[in-house]
Design a protein with these regions (language model features):
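Sec-dependent N-terminal signal peptides
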Residues: 4-13
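Beta-strand-rich N-terminal accessory domains
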Residues: 19-89, 188-193, 202
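Extended, loop-rich substrate-binding clefts of extracytoplasmic carbohydrate-active enzymes
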Residues: 71-143
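Acidic (Asp/Glu-rich), glycine- and aromatic
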Residues: 135-175, 348-360
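Low-complexity, Pro/Ser/Thr- and charge-rich linker/hinge segments at domain boundaries
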Residues: 162-169, 263-282, 351-389
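Aromatic (Trp/Tyr) and acidic
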Residues: 190-211, 222, 275, 283-350, ...
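Beta-strand-rich recognition/accessory modules
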Residues: 199-264, 801
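Acidic, glycine-anchored loop motifs typical of Ca2+
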Residues: 476-493
Length: 809
């Protein structure tokens, strides 16, 4: 018995000591209790996701550890090309081969980068030392040219949002991480910068906090601490060591020791809708736990009243399993139907307060999108809200024909042939009207214009959307928020979207691809939209209009034009007629092009709804084989028009395929995650895709209610409203729910603010397994707002779920 006791003690000691040692795990990153170090698990340096990355007590505190060509790089700065990544379990190390330039980004690609005439290869290795520290070593194949020495260096970026007000120590000096960058300024390689905040051999970050303290020591060149926000508003703090003349092997050698708190475990996170639930709705909270934890056997539900909390339920907690790096359990309180305010308790953790009531989706849900977000995004208008001016009259000098530009920024390209009668630099009339700024930037993309028009039209058709809270005066280019004008806001917004789509079509004889500024300095502008140009056409600051041959995009636009024609028929018959005629003309120009079957099915479905033309119905039936082979991408569109099809074989085969597809989806979802929707986390938050999936599921249910339940689009809405992974369980819809995203990548991001009704993509994946949604205004991959579905899909889902439980009388 005594031998068994000592054996158990030795085993326990071994397990505990293993938790204190930083070692490689089966996911190919270094792990110990309270610390993870990943190394090129991500490669998205423009988005601060790459290189050496430190996750301390569950929070990503440093990233992008790599060799860069400047002390304070930005989004359009050169980044290396990465090669072979080698994981050495025996030596507890990972090495990464890299080189400059990256030919796929050098003056080409979605956002072309201008690289200098510099070619070199290097390798970075990180290695665990056995005491909770790790080393970083940079080896160059050959010395850098003299002119690049001290300019290039190894940079490690520190996330600023968690450091403001904290302190640092550098050898014998100290300082505070300030909320804003300050001078004195100095010229550095032709650019004004503040210079290093401190220089030395040993840097201690946040020495006052055990949960945040990190020590970085250099065994080679001195360490410099820079504030990367001096030249880039979205910059981070940067720790760097420059590459010196003649350096090759061991050009940089650091030891990094992030402090860890013994026995630390991830705190349970209760994920429940920030808005609440209808009494008859399924109500499940999810609790996210440390992977080593065993779920508590029970949870509690409290009702809130005059005396505070009243216990109304104690119920079994159900283990779901593991997903990403956490363990999950579900808390089901669906049987509670009494209206009121509630809180879920799991151990000593309490959720936010939420409502259960029949009117849960009636107000304060979709309305902020229609009352705030869409008006604020309107181009060619001045947008007022009582005393506030959201933005002044903008872009009235739109737009010049873009010159041939193989690689502009933000994905724009202009071929030598623009397929119009306009020459490069000529002002194209009819573009100084309508449209919405695409996202956190100010361009107009035809697909986001059309997508917004389509969703607004579908909400009018499906749910009778008729809401007036805004005065929109097209003649005076004026918007007054919360000043009704007696006209449906959704109708007016559709007219505004059509003004830019059809205005371009009339002038160009085709669709434009988009309208965007010509200069990168304009593009990165943070401020009032009216500041971008002078509103006087014909000079250098005018935006450019881009054109293209793109039948896929033309088919997307047909969808919006055809839907708009139906809802405008009584209110604006002339515009309705032009919309439908343009949709038909676009169809005639694209219908014979091979491929694009999914897009053709969606376009045909909308044309059928608008015309009931037998030729369109027959064309759709003739595409049966293509529909069956691409059903996951287009089957939902058939749901709205299946009633117009008389072909029994077509209907039977489509129904069988829909049944099989939905069964596969269910199996996939159950294996994916506990969130009730198919979910594959990625570098970008998945919220927009999940919303779109939910809208498509609504139409599947509409066409085949006996085969397709409503749970998918209900769960999609709950995901957006807070039932999603990670410690930040805010609603992705700004201003909707108890806690929502209040610092977003919108046009007012420089003010650390938000636009009510904007919807962000949300929780992103820091590969391989960390869900992250930070409070930071400059993560486009987490908190950007977009048109074309980002916000309007959310509106649609709210209305769909509301109608499900509160059907019209």
């Amino acid at each position: 018995m005594k031998k068994l006791f000592f054996a158990l003690l030795i085993l326990l000691s071994t397990i505990l000591s293993a938790q204190d040692v930083l070692r490689l795990n089966d996911k190919e990153y270094f792990h110990k209790e309270g610390l993870d170090v990943t190394f090129f698990s991500d490669y998205y340096p423009e988005g601060h996701q790459s290189g050496v990355t430190i996750i301390q007590h569950g929070v990503r505190v440093a990233a992008n550890g790599d060799l860069r060509l400047e002390p304070s790089p930005g989004q359009w700065s050169p980044v290396p090309k990465w090669g072979v990544r080698t994981v050495d379990l025996e030596n507890q190390s990972i090495s990464q081969r890299l080189w400059y330039p990256d030919s796929s980004k050098n003056r080409r690609g979605f956002n072309p980068v201008i690289y200098p005439d510099l070619n070199f290869f290097y390798q970075i290795e990180i290695k665990a030392t056995g005491d909770g520290s790790f080393t970083v070593t940079v080896d160059l194949d050959e010395p850098l040219p003299d002119e690049w020495c001290d300019r290039a260096g190894f940079n490690l970026e520190l996330f600023p949002g968690d450091l403001f007000g904290k302190t640092y120590l550098m050898d014998g000096t100290s300082g505070i991480f300030m909320d804003q960058p300050v001078g004195p300024m100095q010229e550095y390689d032709g650019e004004p910068l503040t210079g290093p905040l401190a220089t030395g051999r040993s840097l201690v970050i946040a020495p006052e906090l055990d949960l945040q303290r990190v020590v970085i020591k250099s065994q080679s060149e001195p360490i410099e601490l820079w504030d990367g926000r001096t030249n880039h508003n979205n910059g981070w703090y940067i720790v760097r060591s420059p590459i010196t003349k003649g350096a090759t092997r061991g050009a940089v050698r650091w030891t990094i020791t992030p402090n860890t708190v013994k026995g630390w475990k991830y705190d349970p996170v209760i994920q429940v809708s920030q808005l609440g639930y209808h009494p008859n709705q399924e109500k499940k909270a999810i609790v996210e736990l440390d992977a080593t934890e065993t779920p508590l056997p029970e949870f509690k539900l409290f009702r809130l009243g005059e005396e505070g909390r009243e216990l109304v339920m104690e119920k079994e907690t159900r283990l779901w399993g593991e997903f990403l790096r956490y363990k999950y359990a579900t808390l089901d309180f669906s049987s509670i139907e009494e209206p009121g305010i509630y809180q879920v308790a799991y151990g000593d953790k309490l959720s936010h307060a939420f409502r259960i009531d029949k009117d849960i989706y009636d107000k304060g849900t979709w309305q902020p999108t229609l009352e705030y977000y869409l008006p604020v995004q309107m181009c060619h208008m001045r947008v007022n809200e009582k005393y506030r001016v959201w933005h002044d009259l903008c872009h009235m000098d739109d737009a010049k024909m873009a010159p041939p530009t193989p690689f502009h920024f933000d994905g724009y390209q202009q071929a030598e042939e623009n397929h119009t009668h306009f020459h490069a630099g000529e002002v194209v009339p009819g573009l100084d009207q309508g449209g919405w700024h695409d996202a956190g930037d100010y361009d107009l993309r035809v697909e986001s214009q059309s997508g917004t028009v389509w969703l607004l039209a579908k909400m009018i058709e499906e749910f009778g959307l008729d809401h007036d809270a805004t005065m929109i005066d097209f003649e005076r280019h004026l918007v007054e928020i919360h000043q009704p004008d007696g006209i449906s806001d959704a109708i007016q917004q559709i007219e505004h979207g059509l003004a830019t789509i059809l205005g371009g079509y009339r002038s160009l004889g085709r669709l434009y691809r988009g309208i965007i500024c010509s200069d990168l300095r304009q593009y990165v502008m943070l401020g009032d939209a009216a500041s971008m140009t002078d509103n006087i056409p014909g000079n250098k600051d005018d935006r450019w209009v881009f054109t293209e041959l793109n039948p896929r995009r033309e088919l997307q636009v047909i969808q919006g034009l055809a839907a708009a024609s139906r809802v405008l028929k009584e209110f604006n018959p002339e515009l309705a007629k032009e919309s439908l005629e343009t949709a038909i003309a676009l169809w005639e120009g694209t219908s014979e092009i091979k491929g694009l079957s999914s897009q053709k099915v969606v376009a045909l479905s909308e044309l059928i709804l608008s015309t009931q033309n037998p030729a369109y119905i027959n064309a759709l039936v003739d595409m049966k084989a293509e529909i069956l082979s691409s059903l996951p991408r287009c089957g939902w569109a058939i749901g709205s028009v299946i009633k117009y099809i008389d072909d029994p074989l077509f209907k039977s085969e489509i129904q069988i395929a829909v049944k099989a597809f939905q069964e596969d989806l269910k199996k996939q979802q159950e294996a994916d995650s506990p969130y009730g929707v198919p979910y594959k986390p990625d570098i970008w938050g998945a919220g927009w895709n999940i919303q779109r999936f939910g809208v498509e599921q609504y139409f599947y249910h509409k066409g085949w209610p006996e085969l397709v339940p409503t749970e998918f689009f209900e769960h999609a809405l709950n995901f957006i409203l807070g039932v999603h992974p990670g410690p930040n369980n805010a609603s992705f819809a700004s201003g909707v729910g108890s806690n929502s995203i209040k610092v977003a990548y919108g046009v007012n991001r420089a003010d650390w603010s938000f636009i009510p009704g904007g919807v962000v993509s949300g929780t992103a994946l820091i590969r391989p397994d960390l869900p992250e949604l930070k409070t930071w205004p400059y993560f486009w991959q987490q908190t950007e707002y977009v048109m074309g579905g980002g916000a309007t899909n959310f509106m649609f889902l709210v209305m769909a779920v509301n109608e499900l439980y509160n059907p019209p009388l």
